[in-house]
Amino acid sequence: TKISGIPAVLLEVVDREDPIEVGETVTYEIAVTNQGSAEDTNIIVVAEMDPEMQYVSDAGPTKGNVNGRRIEFAPLPQLGVGEKKIWLLTVKAAAAGDFRIRVNMDTDQLTRPVMETEATNFYTTPK
């Protein structure tokens, strides 16, 4: 048996700012990197927000389709060896507390999805 290469895809999710005041926005950076020795195909990224987050916008190599608290990005056809793609998801803080965004990634070569969670603290300033 000859193995010509294996894709190894890394999913990272980080908030660009934390904590965030209620009413303000925070942008999450969703990075997918192919650390393997073969390309990966049909990369699907799905983000799910807590109810206290309101969708504002998204940007990246594929467009997001918003369905309630779920943002499904259109599939990325391929990710070459050593290649990295970044999606940006901006949300508005709607209530005070410690909240999460959950991101799932699946590809043709993965046997099961990869999941990452990022916590962000939303606060209010006393008046």
Language-model region placement:
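Exported/extracytosolic protein signature
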Residues: T1-K127
